[in-house]
């Protein structure tokens, strides 16, 4: 079994090295700005590895008669990855992005069986999933955070949904981490990486919730959820445009204003999610709420102590 993962690792290295050649040739570079947390131009879009590897897994699985990963799901990944990569390399109309996101999420709703729960649940799910995908993208702001946090989330889902063959996605994340989890990153994930990851994760969490009839699985994204929602609330309080780029997430403040290393901050978020995920997997809903509440209190205490109000 490990042989396949080793082959996937080799394929991942090959894909990302080939992408570096393409990105350098076409100038797919993330240049520093007053809203970013990096100071040198860096290759963008290295996360293209995630959808490519997982789509390959999905297509080959179906070809060999294994249908847990449907071609419709692969299509959803393809659509959202394509529009996200387009956004990485060129100016994209927000309307086009929204249309493709809604279409991809509609496939998710259908394939996971959420559509059977009625219009209100479907509408709420679409809003929640699109919001989660965008939040996951916004949290991709420092070296290492997407790689390390996603290792925890995808690792948990690999354990709970072995039929989804997420171990190959986990391998792709590890390959990306080699080039990103460092003081000076070789590449960033880009929208194509973070958005595609978020879509796959959302699909799997939705599948778990439908299969088990338990809502607790949403807390597999609990730490990102806390930082995203609290930051939005504070920005609304300050009457800021929440759709404009900013650097007011706690992780951004720790990495920029406080001068902590990107990898250290990323590890804190990953470890915090790992602890919460352990409770999600092993405990009941009450246990999960208690653990989430503790995480929220700690987060708010740190924010207030740092004067982020």
Residue ranges and their predicted role:
Residues 1-229:
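"…together with the soluble PPM/PP2C metallo-phosphatase catalytic core" -> "…together
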Residues 1-3, 211-309:
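C-terminal membrane-associated helical module and adjoining short loops/tails
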């Amino acid at each position: 079994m490990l042989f396949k993962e080793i082959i996937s690792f080799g394929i991942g290295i090959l894909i990302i090295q080939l992408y570096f050649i393409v990105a350098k040739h076409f100038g797919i570079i993330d240049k520093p700005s007053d809203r970013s947390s990096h100071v040198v131009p860096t290759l963008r879009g290295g996360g293209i590895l995630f959808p490519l590897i997982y789509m390959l897994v999905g297509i080959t699985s179906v070809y060999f008669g294994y249908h847990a990963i449907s071609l419709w799901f692969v299509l959803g990944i393809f659509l959202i990855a394509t529009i996200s990569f387009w956004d990485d390399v060129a100016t994209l109309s927000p309307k086009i992005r929204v249309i493709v996101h809604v279409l991809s999420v509609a496939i998710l709703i259908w394939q996971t069986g959420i559509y059977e729960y009625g219009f209100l649940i479907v509408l709420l799910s679409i809003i929640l999933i699109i919001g989660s995908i965008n939040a996951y993208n916004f949290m991709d702001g420092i070296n290492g955070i997407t790689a390390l946090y996603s290792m925890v989330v995808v690792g948990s889902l690999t354990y709970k949904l072995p039929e989804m063959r997420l171990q190959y996605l986990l391998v792709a994340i590890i390959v990306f981490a080699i080039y990103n989890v460092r003081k000076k990153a070789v590449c960033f994930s880009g929208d194509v990486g973070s958005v595609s990851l978020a879509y796959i994760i959302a699909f799997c969490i939705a599948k778990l919730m439908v299969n088990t009839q338990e809502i607790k699985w949403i807390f597999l994204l609990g730490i990102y959820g806390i930082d995203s929602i609290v930051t939005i609330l504070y920005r609304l309080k300050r009457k800021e445009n929440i759709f404009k780029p900013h650097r007011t997430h706690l992780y951004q403040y720790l990495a920029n204003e406080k001068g902590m290393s990107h990898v250290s901050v990323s590890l804190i978020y990953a470890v915090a999610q790992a602890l919460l995920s352990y409770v999600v997997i092993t405990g009941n809903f009450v246990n999960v709420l208690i653990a989430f509440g503790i995480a929220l209190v700690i987060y708010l205490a740190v924010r207030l102590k740092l004067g982020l109000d």
